[in-house]
UniProtKB/Swiss-Prot annotation:
The record marks 401-402, 582-583, 1217-1218 as: Cleavage. It is found in: Cytoplasm; Nucleus. Residues 48-60, 127-152, 1005-1015, 1054-1082, 1101-1111 have a biased composition (Polar residues). GO terms for molecular function: aspartic-type endopeptidase activity; ATP binding; DNA binding; DNA-directed DNA polymerase activity; RNA binding; RNA-directed DNA polymerase activity; RNA-DNA hybrid ribonuclease activity; zinc ion binding. The modification Phosphoserine is found at residue 416. It comes from Saccharomyces cerevisiae (strain ATCC 204508 / S288c). It catalyses: DNA(n) + a 2'-deoxyribonucleoside 5'-triphosphate = DNA(n+1) + diphosphate; Endonucleolytic cleavage to 5'-phosphomonoester. Retrotransposons are mobile genetic entities that are able to replicate via an RNA intermediate and a reverse transcription step. In contrast to retroviruses, retrotransposons are non-infectious, lack an envelope and remain intracellular. Ty1 retrotransposons belong to the copia elements (pseudoviridae). Residues 583-640 are annotated as: Integrase-type zinc finger-like. Residues 1338-1476 form the Reverse transcriptase Ty1/copia-type domain. One of its GO terms (cellular component) is nucleus. Capsid protein (CA) is the structural component of the virus-like particle (VLP), forming the shell that encapsulates the retrotransposons dimeric RNA genome. The particles are assembled from trimer-clustered units and there are holes in the capsid shells that allow for the diffusion of macromolecules. CA also has nucleocapsid-like chaperone activity, promoting primer tRNA(i)-Met annealing to the multipartite primer-binding site (PBS), dimerization of Ty1 RNA and initiation of reverse transcription. The aspartyl protease (PR) mediates the proteolytic cleavages of the Gag and Gag-Pol polyproteins after assembly of the VLP. This is Transposon Ty1-ML2 Gag-Pol polyprotein.
């Protein structure tokens, strides 16, 4: 019924905006443009159905009033329900409805549901049905004509109108941001227009074309609130809605006004950008036009600063005004008002001098604005005046611009200040000079710029002796006076045009005149207070007035900026005309253009070019006579000197005087070449060359690095060689300014030897041509030799050596002699020379077996330096040898192509060898003597480590155990070799050790592990052979897998448990003959020393000393006993009861007996069945077994002899693969990528924090100008090696903050894009601990700072580009880096150099030599770790002064100022420190461990008990086969890396008691057996149980006059594989433990004494370095002590017997220790084994012993 009524009264029905909706919703991810025809039909059908079913809602459903709005609601539209918007989008009507709103007088409701009004419901497109009124209406809401008073159309034409006007309207987009509202309104208005509602939209005057109906208002209200959510509305829109929430029309009206305003703004900007002015219109009109535009833009929020405005104005100047572009472009602080002053001046002079020369004003403008300094272009010095004192600056040349006023200055008391007015000065005749408009104000508004001029005022200057003025308008009685000489404050002449009188008319009607000079070459009109004083006028700056001596006030003084001014309105104008002023100075040069000005005008061309151009009339408008060339001869343009600076010209033949002045070998040239990248570690990366000036004799020496000691060794060698071989002394060495030559060490060496260093100037390579050309020649020869021979690149220096030998023997075209002949040497015997790379066969006199071939193919390199042999490269052994036992391959009889060097590595067949050769050995000389040694210890490349790059990924495939066995020969017939050379293979096998030296010794095959690093002592130490208490090695491992042993002999490795081996025949040490004697224990040695050593007999007996110390040296200043007590007094040693002197403790009596059974341990060691076998027999046994295995594997048949398989199974490949491809293991990643942190992060709160951190990082990058934002580059145009990938990484810091960092992928950075010689230094951990210890003893304040984004302060020198992150959508573009982005290889070094330079130059610091990142001055010590700074000072103000200086340049944050006298807590480089000044310091990591250890997924406290020690003695790591698949192996290795990584970090920070256990397990990272993992879990469990332990320091006694530095040393003899010994050292400063070290001895020791000597010798260098650091930081005297529990070691160190030691290695170490004791005041004392706290560094100890040795210093 009701629906029928609706159809009958369709002319007042509500529209189909709510009725014609479908029941289907459009998915949010649907393409809004993809609307198929089928969907259109569905929409139409649904619309029809909905129209037919539309009903009204009963009146009882009216909604209550909205409680959120207190103001009354409009009668026409009801308030919404439950908030500012309707809950169901339903509009109701109260009783005050207008007619036509409802049927039969009942309230009607329009059903609007949220989904119906949603933009997603109405499919956008041409078929969209929103908004469309129902067909019963007759027509959509059409816009009636203004004449029509009806709102709706006539029903008679409903059908036709509906047909003609029906269309589908795309809804407006959703508003998503307040900033997008202006653009959204435009689309909304367009939406209303398309909906036939254009008539209700307000016009420009704010009124619509027609009145809006109620239905339209309802529609307007609902659509606005749906598509413009309240949270995204601008503030001004919310303000309107808060008054009337339905007033949408007001919002539309104001939005249209803003659009019109935006249009006006755009027009103003276009006008301002296209300004044109040539003087055809008055300057006032032009100024008014420009200022109005700028004011309008500023009022609308578009700020146009002075610089931009001036540039736009000057760009539009033309004609005479164009000249201002060149005179004003350098003034950075110029204002618009200043520029218009110049425009006005030119315009007025144009008007006043129309009959004069056209360019006359231009000349004056030139002199005024561009030639202030006359012939001297140096910028005049500005002397600032004290605003509270009298101006006392001297007369100065004016700056090049005037200054305008602004509007924020207070007025003065004596004169009212009015707004600037302009009144032209009326002159008596047409020749009167017009000087512009006079300023009438006596007080002005001013800015704070001290260099601004106050227009219309004179500057009061107490330092000026004469008054100077620029304008002739006020000069009376002008006359010429060329004899006046005036200079400015910089002693530069100021040209004077005229002299006259300056007449004043003051407030009291008195008139006064003073002398004045006229010159246009000043910036300010200067009024001399001295000349005013001569006429009884003084300036009172307290009252700010000019007054007479009787107190009569004459005129007010204005304070503007830093100066004081008096108004020109008190000056009387004159009637001087333009010609009068011009003709005052009769000098011809004053009417000419000054040459400096012409020089700048003509683009700084040289004088000759300018003169020639003027003479030939190539430049018009003036000729050569118009230029004053009086100063052109001696004129120097500073800009030209800077911009055109060039290197000095080198005169040909300039070095001839050196050749005539010096004898041979007195003048040398030297230079360093390198580095050569991608080479093995054992191959040299550099070489240093020397060339004699006179003879041109050349020497080359290989270098592995450019360190000071390496360079010094070469210099020592070359000087000794020249002195001994040529009986000459080097007088001068010429070199460049590289740091390797300019360092202090080399400088002192040259000075000591009386050699003068001659350095080249910076960046002047031509001055170093001799050395540079030699390096280029040798490098060309090297490339040619390698190309011709086909030898691998790691032999590059051999090619250099060969070329040097040949070049020294070739004659010079100039001298017709060779360098050898000039040096007096015989010519080169070419019969002894072979072509580089000549194939040869080398005799092997000691093959692996009797059936192996005796000849080894090789390639000749160059003659030996040290013998009559030849250096030959053996590819099969990957080494070079020095031998004469070789035969040259020649002719067609060569069968070298049948040798298979290494099928796994070499891809080229040996038949490809080229390079012809000629044999120089006769046929009867082929058989060489067998008694010559094949090897030579002198060869610099005797061991070749293979190429470290591109390791073979052996983890992905099985490797046969027979990979390293001798290769078999080819079974097929091979082609015979022609007479051309055989080309050697270019690649070498990266998996064969460099230690395989000919003759091939049979070695144990223990696989070594390299590059496992720990942060020990603040640095990096390599961790070596694993073992807690290792058992003997299986004798079945291949010898080829002993691939890294040499690496570990030269590193600070960590080793394993100690066992007391006795009764082993050894050679005695010290002063005895080499005889075999029984091994004795330390106690027996101690007894023997007591009976034999007189110094020990003289010392107090042991029962009278609680420490049982044996002194070594008797000091002259302090008694031995006092020194001993002083050193021992404060050490944290355990308390033990005194023992009988005849009873000596056995430090190993608590150790359990060694297991007698033998396991499959691949690492060998102390688990052997016969612990007392001699060393020689033990080694021979291993070698013999290895040989048997290798022979058996050569003939092994896996099919027929499966049951007899040798002891190594295929599963062992997991350990082998890990050793060979250790670099393939990915590092632990603790950060998140962008997609992990933001895109796919389901934790909303964390995601928001990461987003905030991301925006903060982006803003910081833009603030620091990290890259060039002016230009983006195409990827195709840039060299790929200069392109660096970039990415964002995210992590959560320890303090809970979320951090984002934009980093470069330095891990894939090309080597050519950075200097590998640069180092990124950080403070050494020992330096930090030393500084903290000294701070405690000296009551220092400790201040902690942080520099934000430190790397970004360092500029980058190289040309590098980065790819923007992928999510930024710039995949095809590149941006150029300007700053050192985090992640780049050179960023750390660049930042170090930047902050180092700033600390030295600006903060007055100096870096402590030998201790990078430690800076000091007389008051402050600074430790620098990247962006963290720790400041130590006795005076807190000294720290604050440094902080103030740092903040001037860097964003410096004070983390902890350290000013409290109570306990202060720090977090310094991972250490949690509690410090109470003058009392104690505690160092720990409890909070960090509490957070990190649970994240390691270690089963903590599995048995519910706490561990008392990290390990127990008697535990052995089994080295059985590791039966594990690939994936599980990698997973466990990754787990071990995490666990040991954390343990190493903690151990080397402060838990020195755990170092032995940490290092032992670290060596098993690549052998993650179940036993190793369990032991690692036990170590982590102990760290968890003792996480609250701290390293405790107490302040030293204030009465102590000295600093005491002590090293406690210990060694465990022979408890490592190959009978290596474990050594350990602990370092203490004033009784406080500051560091520790546990490592494996690099040499095999044959007794406990040798092991102890090795341990002590390892501690001495660091002891000396720490001593130097302490003396630099604290000037107190220092006592160095060394404690050991080996009396025999003490006896050897103390002995004066100089007989030969057992071997040169330990003899050298012992003699070094003697020198330290005798020459460096090192005191050595004995300490009981049970008190030796270094014992924890060398072996696992029982719980009781472990606690006893550690509980005094860590608890």
């Amino acid at each position: 019924m009701e629906s029928q009524q609706l159809s009958q009264h369709s002319h007042i029905s509500h529209g189909s905006a709510c009725a014609s909706v479908t029941s289907k919703e459009v998915h949010t991810n649907q393409d809004p443009l993809d609307v198929s025809a089928s969907k259109t039909e569905e929409c139409e059908k649904a619309s029809t159905k909905a129209n037919s079913q539309q009903t009204t809602t009963p009146a009882s459903s009216a909604v209550p009033e909205n409680p959120h709005h207190a103001s009354p609601q409009p009668a026409s539209v009801p308030p919404p329900q439950n908030g500012p918007y309707p809950q169901q989008c339903m509009m109701t009507q109260n009783q005050a409805n207008p007619s036509g709103w409802s049927f039969y007088g009942h309230p009607s409701m329009i059903p609007y549901t949220p989904y119906q009004m949603s933009p997603m419901y109405f499919p956008p497109g041409p078929q969209s049905q929103f908004p469309q009124y129902p067909s019963s209406v007759g027509t959509p809401l059409s816009t009636p004509s203004p004449e029509s008073g009806n709102t709706f159309t006539d029903s008679s034409s409903a059908d036709s109108d509906m047909t003609s006007t029906k269309k589908y309207v795309r809804p407006p987009p959703m508003l998503t941001s307040p900033n997008d509202f202006p653009n959204w309104v435009k689309t909304y208005i367009k939406f209303l227009q398309n909906s036939n509602l254009g008539g209700i939209i307000p016009t420009v005057n704010g009124k619509p074309v027609r009145q809006i109906t109620d239905d339209e208002l309802t529609f307007l209200y609902n659509t606005f609130q749906i598509f413009a959510p309240s949270q995204f509305l601008p503030t001004w829109v919310k303000d309107i809605l808060s008054v009337d929430y339905t007033d949408i029309m007001k919002i539309l009206s104001k939005s249209i006004e803003k659009m019109q305003s935006d249009t006006q703004e755009a027009n103003d900007i276009v006008t301002l950008a296209n300004l044109q002015y040539n003087g055809s219109t008055p300057a006032d009109a032009f100024e008014t036009k420009v200022t109005n535009i700028i004011d309008r833009l500023n009022n609308n929020g578009i700020h146009i600063n002075n610089k931009v405005a001036c540039q736009l104005i000057m760009r539009g100047l033309s004609g005479e005004y164009k000249f201002l572009r060149y005179t004003r472009h350098r003034h950075l602080n110029m204002t618009v008002a200043e520029l218009f002053l110049d425009i006005h001046a030119i315009y007025e002079e144009q008007q006043g001098s129309r009959n004069s020369k056209p360019n006359y004003r231009r000349n004056l403008s030139d002199e005024k604005n561009d030639s202030r300094s006359y012939t001297n272009t140096t910028k005049p010095k500005v002397i600032a005046r004290n605003p509270q004192k009298t101006n006392n600056s001297k007369s100065k040349t004016a700056r090049a611009h005037n200054v305008s006023t602004s509007n924020n200055s207070p007025s003065t008391d004596n004169d009212s200040i009015s707004k600037s007015t302009t009144e032209p000065i009326q002159l008596n005749n047409k020749h009167d000079l017009h000087l512009g408009q006079e300023l009438t104000e006596s007080t002005v508004n001013h800015t704070n710029h001290s260099d601004d001029e106050l227009p219309g005022h004179l500057l009061l200057d107490s330092g000026a002796s004469r008054t100077l003025i620029r304008s002739a308008h006020h000069i009376h009685s002008a006359s010429s006076n060329p004899d006046i000489n005036v200079v400015d404050a910089q002693k530069r002449n100021i040209p004077i045009n005229a002299i006259g009188d300056l007449q004043f008319h003051f407030q009291d009607n008195t008139k006064t005149s003073i002398k004045v000079l006229h010159t246009p070459n000043i910036a300010y009109d200067l009024l001399s207070l001295n000349e005013l004083a001569a006429v009884d006028i003084t300036a009172c700056f307290t009252k700010n007035v000019l007054e007479r001596s009787d107190g009569t006030v004459l005129a007010p003084i204005v304070k503007y900026g830093d100066f004081y001014w008096v108004s020109k309105k008190y000056l009387l104008p004159s009637n001087i005309s333009v010609p009068t002023i011009n003709n005052v100075h009769t000098s011809e040069s004053t009417r000419k253009y000054p040459y400096p000005f012409i020089h700048r005008m003509l683009a700084h061309a040289n004088a000759q070019t300018i003169r020639y151009s003027l003479k030939n009339n190539t430049i018009t408008y003036f000729n050569e006579s118009d230029v004053d060339r009086s100063s052109a001869i001696d004129y120097q343009c500073p800009d030209c000197l800077i911009g055109k600076s060039t290197k000095h010209r080198h005169i040909k033949g300039s070095r001839l005087k050196y050749q005539n002045s010096y004898e041979p070998f007195q003048y040398l040239h030297t230079d360093i070449f390198g580095p050569v990248h991608n080479l093995p570690k054992s191959a040299p990366s550099y070489f240093i060359s020397f060339t004699d000036e006179t003879t041109k004799f050349r020497w080359v020496y290989p270098l592995h690095d450019r360190r000071e000691d390496s360079i010094l060794d070469v210099f020592t060698t070359i000087l000794a060689f020249i002195k001994n071989q040529f009986q000459a002394s080097v007088l001068v060495i010429q070199m460049d300014r590289g740091s390797e030559y300019t360092n202090r060490t080399l400088h002192k060496f040259l000075e000591k030897n009386g050699i003068t260093p001659c350095y080249t100037t910076t960046a002047d390579s031509r001055a170093h041509g001799v050395a540079e050309r030699l390096n280029r020649t040798l490098l060309d020869d090297c490339r040619t030799q390698l190309q011709c021979s086909g030898l691998p690149n790691h032999l590059w220096f051999s090619a250099i050596e060969f070329s040097t030998i040949v070049r020294n023997s070739l004659a010079s075209p100039k001298s017709k002699k060779s360098a050898r002949q000039h040096a007096g040497l015989a010519g080169l015997d070419i019969s002894t020379l072979l072509p580089f790379g000549q194939p040869v066969i080398v005799n092997d006199h000691n093959p692996n077996s009797k059936i192996h071939p005796r000849g080894i193919p090789g390639y000749a390199l160059h003659p030996s330096r040290n013998s009559y042999g030849y250096i030959i490269y053996l590819p099969s052994l990957k080494k070079t040898v020095d031998t004469t036992n070789y035969v040259i391959l020649q002719g067609k009889e060569s069968r070298l192509d049948q040798f298979n060097y290494d099928a796994l590595t070499f891809d080229e067949d040996l038949n490809r060898l080229t390079a012809s050769y000629q044999s120089f050995i006769a046929s009867n000389e082929i058989q060489q003597s067998d008694d010559l040694n094949i090897e030579s210890d002198h060869d610099f490349q005797s061991d070749i480590e293979l190429h470290p790059e591109q390791p073979r990924n052996v983890l992905s495939k099985a490797v046969s155990p027979t990979d390293s066995t001798p290769p078999s020969t080819h079974t097929e017939d091979s082609k015979r070799v022609s007479k051309t050379n055989i080309r050697a293979p270019r690649e070498v096998d990266p998996n064969i050790s460099e230690s395989n030296i000919l003759p091939s010794k049979k070695r144990s095959s223990t696989p070594q592990i390299s590059n496992i690093e720990s942060t020990g002592s603040g640095g990096m130490h390599k961790l070596n052979v694993p073992l807690l208490a290792p058992m003997s090695q299986s004798n079945t491992h291949e010898s080829s897998h002993a691939s890294k042993s040499k690496d570990f002999r030269h590193s600070d490795s960590y080793s394993e448990n100690e066992t007391n081996h006795t009764n082993v025949p050894i050679s005695s040490t010290g002063g005895t003959n080499n005889k075999t004697v029984p091994q004795i224990s330390d106690q027996e040695t101690e007894k023997r020393i007591i009976h034999r050593s007189p110094s020990i007999d003289a010392s107090p007996p042991e029962n009278n000393s609680s420490h049982n110390i044996v002194p070594i040296k008797t000091p002259t200043t302090v008694s031995e006993q006092n020194t001993e007590e002083s050193i021992i007094a404060d050490l944290p040693l355990p308390d033990l009861p005194p023992e009988s002197p005849t009873e000596f403790p056995d430090p190993f009596k608590e150790l359990p007996p060694i297991n007698s059974h033998q396991t499959n341990s691949s690492l060998g060691g102390i688990g052997d069945s016969n612990a007392y076998t001699t060393i020689n027999s033990k080694k021979r046994s291993l070698e013999d077994n290895e040989t048997e295995i290798k022979v058996s594997r050569d003939t092994w048949n896996t099919k027929n002899m499966r049951s007899l398989e040798p002891p190594r199974s295929k599963k062992r490949i997991h350990l082998i693969a890990a050793v060979k491809a250790v670099k393939s293991i990915k590092p632990i990643r603790t950060t998140l990528r962008y997609d992990e942190a933001i895109t796919y992060n389901k934790d909303i709160k964390e995601k928001e924090k990461y987003i905030e951190a991301y925006h903060k990082e982006v803003n910081q990058l833009l603030k620091m100008k990290t890259w060039d934002t002016d230009e983006y580059y195409d990827r195709k145009e840039i060299d790929p090696k200069r392109v660096i990938n970039s990415m964002f990484i995210f992590n959560k810091k320890r303090d809970g903050t979320h951090k984002a960092r934009f980093v470069a992928r330095g891990d894939i950075q090309h080597p050519d894009t950075y200097d590998s010689g640069m180092q990124s230094n950080t403070v050494h951990h020992y330096a930090l601990m030393t500084s903290l210890s000294l701070a405690l003893d000296n009551n220092y304040y400790i201040t902690q700072l942080d520099i934000s984004s430190a790397y970004l302060y360092a500029d980058i020198k190289e040309e590098l580009y980065i790819r923007p992150p992928p999510h930024l959508g710039m995949n095809d573009k590149l941006i150029r880096l300007k700053k050192s982005l985090y992640g780049l290889k050179q960023s750390g070094a660049n930042w170090y150099e930047t902050i180092k330079s700033y600390l030295i130059k600006q903060c007055g610091m100096e870096e402590v030599r030998g201790w990078s990142c430690v800076f000091k001055n007389s008051q402050v010590t600074i430790c620098l770790f990247v962006d963290d700074m720790i400041l130590f000072s006795k005076d807190l103000n000294a720290n604050k002064k440094i902080i103030t200086t740092l903040k001037k340049q860097y964003d410096t944050k004070i983390i902890n100022l350290g000013e409290s006298d109570n306990e202060i807590q720090y977090d310094i480089l991972g250490l949690e420190i509690k410090y109470q000044r003058g009392k104690y310091m505690k160092l720990g990591m409890e909070n960090s461990l509490t957070e990190k250890i649970p994240k390691l997924n270690v089963p903590l406290n599995p048995k519910g008990r706490k561990l008392s020690a990290p390990g127990q003695p008697g535990l052995y790591i089994d080295q059985d086969e590791l039966e594990i698949d690939e994936d599980e192996y990698k997973e466990k290795v990754h787990e071990m890396q995490k666990l040991i990584g954390l343990a190493s970090y903690v151990g080397y920070k402060f838990r020195f008691d755990l170092l032995y256990y940490i290092n032992t397990l670290a060596q098993h990272i690549l052998f993650p057996s179940r036993q190793v993992l369990d032991m690692t879990y036990e170590l982590i469990q102990f760290m968890w149980d003792t996480r609250d332990k701290q390293l405790i320091w107490h302040k030293n006694k204030p009465t102590e006059p000295d600093n005491k530095l002590v090293a406690i040393s210990d060694a465990s003899y022979g408890n490592q594989p190959y009978y290596k010994s474990q050594i350990g050292n602990i370092y203490l400063l004033n009784g406080k433990v500051i560091g520790g070290k546990s490592t494996k001895a690099s040499l095999t020791c044959t007794s406990t004494t040798e092991a102890e000597i090795h341990a002590i010798s390892e501690s001495v260098p660091l002891l000396n370095n720490l001593s130097y650091l302490i003396q630099e930081l604290n000037k107190k005297p220092i006592i160095k002590g060394l404690l050991t529990d080996s009396r025999s070691t003490i006896s050897i160190i103390k002995s004066t017997n100089e007989e030969k030691f057992r071997n040169r290695f330990f003899g050298t170490k012992a003699m070094r220790l003697r020198d330290e004791v005798s020459g460096n005041n090192l005191y050595v004392y004995y300490i009981e084994t049970k008190k030796n706290i270094a014992d924890v560094m060398t072996k696992p100890l029982p719980i009781k012993t472990f606690k006893l040795l550690t509980n005094k210093w860590i608890h």
